[in-house]
């Protein structure tokens, strides 16, 4: 399948607020204490849209050692309002690996479109989760044992001249629906210290989720959103290029500006700007949240009404016409809104009233 036909241009983060935003403003007009900047509590689960929940759950649990924590079904009008997709009937599974979790969602109705088979790592709908491993050779051998579709030619070790990333080993591959995933190994002195603690307590090499990475067209524009609006902090930067990078992401001649952001807990978010080549395609402007390429990131924040007011003030693009209960996604009792970043990536901004450390 080629790219879906593009429709109207995507609204940038600085354009006029759409009618749904004006409706939210009316609903939240009594909020006080609007923060100058949102302070997120955590980056929550990454949500992957799958075509067959049973198949996807089997892949993640049997191949990658995730554990199924919960499954549920829903066909609520409130979920239609949250997602901007009418007539939803969904199945959701929450899967855990270490301290992190992902949510797999199958839209039984309406069915979304598949991931374009010619998708590349520099296309701007690209989003992966990075799974930390204690032993790259053992982890990659397990993938090959299950005939997993690779993106990388083989596991790559980043070169010594790249001081911020030297010695890190990584491998890109795909799940059964074509979602890109990454295995990542941190040598001593690199990565979060927790990845080097208690590794012997796990049966296999898969430890947890370090970050989700998204392709962006302009790092500075994206920092204006993720750092300046959403309140994430920059914790690292790197410029990756050379044969190892080309073979890792399977993009010839790639020079990638990588910016790492974090909240107080949960996985990080990495911005990937391909300085070369510049032929990555923008996300289709008619993308819906049930399309399989439309992964979404959960961001959990306090002072929810005031934070939503701040998003409105910053003219962020809203999908939800007003805050809704997020179930079957997220925490029980949580409310949220679905928004888009400047490149079209979806974010579920969720209230933190019932949040607890995962």
Give the residues covered by each predicted segment.
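N-terminal secretory signal peptides that target proteins for export/translocation
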Residues: 1-18
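Bacterial N-terminal signal peptides
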Residues: 21-33
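Core segments of cupin and vicinal oxygen chelate
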Residues: 49-99, 138, 145, 164-166, ...
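Short consensus segments that form the blades of beta-propeller domains
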Residues: 83-85, 118-121, 162, 203, ...
């Amino acid at each position: 399948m080629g790219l879906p036909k593009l429709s109207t241009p995507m609204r940038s983060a600085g354009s006029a607020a759409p009618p749904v935003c004006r409706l939210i403003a009316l609903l939240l007009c009594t909020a006080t204490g609007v923060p100058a900047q949102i302070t997120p509590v955590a980056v929550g689960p990454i949500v992957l849209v799958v075509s067959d929940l049973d198949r996807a759950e089997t892949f993640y649990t049997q191949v990658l050692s995730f554990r199924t924590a919960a499954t549920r079904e829903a066909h609520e009008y409130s979920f239609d309002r949250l997602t901007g997709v009418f007539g939803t009937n969904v199945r959701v599974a929450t899967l855990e690996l270490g301290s992190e979790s992902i949510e797999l969602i199958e839209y039984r109705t309406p069915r979304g479109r598949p991931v374009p088979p010619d998708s590349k790592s520099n296309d701007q709908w690209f989003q992966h989760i990075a799974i930390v491993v204690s032993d790259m050779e053992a982890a990659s051998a397990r993938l090959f044992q299950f005939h997993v579709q690779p993106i990388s030619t083989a596991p790559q070790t980043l070169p010594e001249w790249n001081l911020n990333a030297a010695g890190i080993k990584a491998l890109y591959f795909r799940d059964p629906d074509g979602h890109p995933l990454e295995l990542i190994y941190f040598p001593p002195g690199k990565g979060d210290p927790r990845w080097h603690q208690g590794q012997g307590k796990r049966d296999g090499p898969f430890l947890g989720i370090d970050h989700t990475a998204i392709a962006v067209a302009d790092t500075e524009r994206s920092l204006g959103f993720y750092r300046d609006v959403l309140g994430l902090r920059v914790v690292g930067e790197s410029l990756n290029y050379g044969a190892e990078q080309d073979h890792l992401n399977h993009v010839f001649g790639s020079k990638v500006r990588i910016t790492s952001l974090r909240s107080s807990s949960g996985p990080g978010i990495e911005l990937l700007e391909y300085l070369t080549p510049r032929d990555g395609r923008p996300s289709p402007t008619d993308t819906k949240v049930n399309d399989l390429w439309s992964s979404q990131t959960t961001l959990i924040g306090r002072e929810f009404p005031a934070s939503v007011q701040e998003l409105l003030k910053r003219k962020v693009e809203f999908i939800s016409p007003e805050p809704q209960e997020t179930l079957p996604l997220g925490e029980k009792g949580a409310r949220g809104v679905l928004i888009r970043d400047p490149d079209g990536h979806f974010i579920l901004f969720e209230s933190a009233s019932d949040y607890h450390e995962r």
